[in-house]
């Protein structure tokens, strides 16, 4: 295993650790919410307010950990691409090396600053790999197409039998062409919409 591969492993591990921290904060938030209910039932609004503040703090912390986990994971994917293409520059390797120590601290501010530095290193690589990314599906970009996110949210809501009350663009398909599966999905969506209108 090369040094770069070790750093890549550490990046992926850190992303998982950040994800675990987010889940821990979620649990803490739920525990605080339970304490809020108990305090309200006892008529102790002062204590309820403290638990409410704690719950909100834990929720925000969970979101921060989750966001950073996704960001580190995206950078790991880009390192993987660079390693695969043999495009790892000396400056990029230096930044990746300094990541190991920073990621162990789990300090979100330091990790964020390092991610900024790393993403800057990739701007040059992005220019070099643009042609390659045009021919393959881009799995290394740090942003996710909003349309895909909206469609997934709607799909999950439909499975759960919920209504998101969102206006989603209809008929969004890839530039390669419409597959049979997506055509069937569109037809199902239209039938589902008609059924909802009848209810």
UniProtKB/Swiss-Prot annotation:
Subcellular location: Cytoplasm, Cytosol; Endosome; Late endosome membrane
Stretches assigned to coiled coil: 26-48, 178-199
Region (Interaction with VPS4A, MITD1 and STAMBP): 180-196
Ranges where the record places region Interaction with VTA1: 180-199
Residue segments, region Interaction with SPAST: 174-199
Region feature Interaction with VPS4B, mapped onto this chain: 183-199
Polar residues composition bias: residue spans: 170-182
Top-rank taxon: Eukaryota
Short motif MIT-interacting motif, span: 186-196
Keywords recorded for this protein, A-Z: Cell cycle, Cell division, Coiled coil, Cytoplasm, Endosome, Membrane, Protein transport, Transport
Any Gene Ontology CC annotation: midbody
Topology of this chain in the membrane: Peripheral membrane protein
A GO biological process held by the record: regulation of mitotic spindle assembly
GO MF annotations, alphabetized: identical protein binding; MIT domain binding
The keyword Transmembrane appears for this protein: no
Renumbered residue ranges of the record's region Interaction with IST1: 132-156
Disordered as annotated region, ranges: 167-199
Self-association state and partner proteins as the record states: Probable peripherally associated component of the endosomal sorting required for transport complex III (ESCRT-III). ESCRT-III components are thought to multimerize to form a flat lattice on the perimeter membrane of the endosome. Several assembly forms of ESCRT-III may exist that interact and act sequentially. Interacts with CHMP1A. Interacts with VTA1; the interaction probably involves the open conformation of CHMP1B. Interacts with CHMP2A. Interacts with VPS4A; the interaction is direct. Interacts with VPS4B; the interaction is direct.
Family: Belongs to the SNF7 family.
Reported function: Probable peripherally associated component of the endosomal sorting required for transport complex III (ESCRT-III) which is involved in multivesicular bodies (MVBs) formation and sorting of endosomal cargo proteins into MVBs. MVBs contain intraluminal vesicles (ILVs) that are generated by invagination and scission from the limiting membrane of the endosome and mostly are delivered to lysosomes enabling degradation of membrane proteins, such as stimulated growth factor receptors, lysosomal enzymes and lipids.
Name of the protein described by the UniProt record: Charged multivesicular body protein 1b
């Amino acid at each position: 295993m090369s040094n770069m591969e070790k750093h890549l492993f550490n990046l992926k591990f850190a992303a998982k650790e950040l994800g675990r921290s987010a889940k821990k904060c979620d649990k803490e938030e739920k525990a605080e919410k339970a304490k809020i209910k108990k305090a309200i039932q006892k008529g102790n609004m002062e204590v309820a307010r403290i638990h409410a503040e704690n719950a909100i703090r834990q929720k925000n912390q969970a979101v921060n950990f989750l966001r950073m986990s996704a960001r580190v994971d995206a950078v790991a994917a880009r390192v993987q691409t660079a390693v695969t293409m043999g495009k790892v520059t000396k400056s990029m390797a230096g930044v990746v090396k300094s990541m190991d120590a920073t990621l162990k601290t789990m300090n979100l501010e330091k990790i964020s600053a390092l991610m900024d530095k790393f993403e800057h290193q990739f701007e040059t690589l992005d220019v070099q790999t643009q042609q390659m990314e045009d021919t393959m599906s881009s799995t290394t970009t740090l942003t996710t197409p909003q349309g895909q996110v909206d469609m997934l949210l709607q799909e999950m809501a439909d499975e759960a039998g919920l209504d998101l009350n969102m206006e989603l663009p209809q008929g969004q398909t890839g530039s390669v062409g419409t597959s049979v599966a997506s055509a069937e999905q569109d037809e199902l969506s239209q039938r589902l919409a008609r059924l909802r209108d009848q209810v």
